Swiss-Prot record:
The keyword Membrane applies. GO terms for biological process: transmembrane transport. The chain crosses the membrane at residues 15-35, 54-74, 87-107, 112-132, 144-164, 166-186, 205-225, 229-249, 269-289, 308-328, 334-354, 357-377, 400-420, 428-448. This is Uncharacterized transporter YebQ. Belongs to the major facilitator superfamily. TCR/Tet family. The gene is yebQ.
Length: 457
């Protein structure tokens, strides 16, 4: 077990610690993406309808969003290492439960439990990176983390398709078992403990319940809207969400260490970074959901061509994210974020202005701009969110980072559904235009951070 370090772990312990983070976050992100590809197969095998099989995906996402902040708070209480190891155990066992499921109900329950395990991993992974890396190299750690998330998100469908071509859908989950065991052994050997703190915060159960209801109802309503559910049901969910949310926020304002980190949101640099994150992930999801419809329906490209034309975006993000991690050590995150998001907006506007029959190269280079711009923004923004919070509140900052990402992505997907319902085939153009405008707004908000002092790890 590594000793507590004042400024990061020494080598080679640092390599072992970051490896367990890489494996854990890869599994959590991949399992959010691979199930989509397998839904038709799962529905057929378990004798379920396509509509009901969507809950295999929804259950995982909802479980994550309702528990992220609670697990991050528990990380501040009991240590990020302990929560991470518990998350690995839950994720490993629930993956086995998923593979052994013989009904849709059983699989959905297993996915809920797996979502809680994934939330435990996501809630403290960036807080752990803050403990693993020395202050001067923290940007590189954030760059590696952003790189892994980008690779996992992009590779998820491909990995799922490869596994399904040679094995049953159960192996999508069984593959997590050996990986989880390796990650757990590495975590027990290399992950550092939290530093000592003067007092331990108290976990407030009513806050956790209200947090789950508020964010769970919001994500359920957004997902339901995107899937064309009853507007009456969606409106009822939103009304209950608002009522519970008001009581939730009022309670947080009265607590010395709140579950929803309103204390951190009072820090201008932190709140501006969270706002930038929500807007940028909303813009990203608006584009990524609408682009396949645009390429196939409007431009007449095949499914294979669509996949190839979309590939430059995640590839550019993967290349740029580690580079941005190095740049944050020298350039203000607000400037890097603004520049990256303006580049992303330029790529999106270029896609909006494409002619009726564009050459492939004229689709590819805007995709590269979008991916490179997003990669230039993401690592510095994550770095700022974590380092603008006090060290003892790193868990709260890490949980808020993940929550902002999920809220942005869910909102973006719902907006695409709205645009397609309102504007038909033109909805893809409107969605891309909305994404570009949101990217500009996010760039402007990021630019406001330049007036704030640079965060210190």
């Amino acid at each position: 077990m590594p000793k507590v370090q004042a400024d990061g772990l020494p080598l080679p312990q640092r390599y072992g610690a970051i490896l367990t983070i890489v494996i854990g976050i890869s599994m959590a992100v991949l399992d959010g993406a691979i199930a989509n590809v397998a839904l038709p197969t799962i529905a057929t095998d378990l004798h379920a309808t396509p509509a009901s099989s969507i809950w295999v995906v929804n259950a995982y996402q909802i479980a994550i969003v309702i528990s992220l902040l609670s697990f991050s708070f528990l990380g501040d209480m009991f240590g990020y290492r302990r929560i991470y190891k518990c998350g690995l155990v839950v994720f490993l066992l629930s993956s086995l439960f998923c593979a052994l499921s013989d009904s849709l109900q059983m699989l959905t329950l297993a996915r809920v439990i797996q979502g809680f395990g994934g939330a435990a991993l996501m809630s403290v992974n960036t807080a752990l990176i803050r403990l693993i890396y020395p202050q001067r190299f923290l940007g590189r750690g954030m760059g590696i983390n952003s790189f892994i998330v980008a690779v996992s998100s992009a590779a998820g469908p491909t990995i799922a398709a490869a596994i399904l071509s040679i094995a049953s859908w159960k192996w999508l989950f069984l593959i997590n078992v050996p990986l989880g065991i390796i990650a757990l052994l590495l975590a027990m050997r290399f992950l550092p403990p939290n530093g000592s703190r003067a007092s331990k915060p108290r976990f407030d159960l009513p806050s956790a319940v209200m947090n789950a209801l508020t964010f769970g109802l919001l994500i359920t309503a957004l997902s339901g809207f995107a899937q064309g559910q009853s507007l009456t049901l969606i409106a009822a969910e939103l009304v209950v969400m608002v009522v519970v949310g008001i009581f939730f926020i009022r309670r947080q304002l009265s607590l010395p260490v709140p579950l929803l980190p309103v204390d951190l949101l009072r820090i201008p640099l932190f709140s501006l970074s969270i706002c930038t994150s929500v807007c940028s992930f909303c813009a990203q999801m608006l584009a990524m959901v609408s682009l396949p419809f645009y390429l196939q329906t409007v431009l007449g490209r095949s499914e294979v061509e669509t996949g190839l034309l979309l590939t430059p975006w995640p590839l550019a993000t993967m290349v740029m994210a580690p580079l941005a991690g190095y740049l944050i050590e020298r350039v203000h995150a607000g400037l890097l974020g603004a520049l990256g998001l303006f580049i992303m907006a330029a790529g999106l506007f270029s896609l909006v202005l494409l002619p009726a029959s564009p050459a492939d190269i004229n689709i590819i280079w805007p995709m590269i701009l979008c991916g490179a711009g997003f990669g230039l923004f993401q690592s510095p923004n994550n770095h700022t969110i974590i380092t603008s919070a006090p060290r003892e509140r790193s868990g709260g900052a890490s949980g808020m980072l993940g929550t902002a990402r999920l809220l942005g992505q869910s909102s973006g997907a719902a907006l695409v559904a709205l645009m397609l319902n309102q504007f038909g085939d033109n909805g893809t153009h409107v969605s891309l235009m909305a994404a570009a405008i949101l990217a500009v707004i996010a760039a402007c908000v990021s630019g406001l951070r330049i007036t704030q002092p640079r965060s210190r790890a």
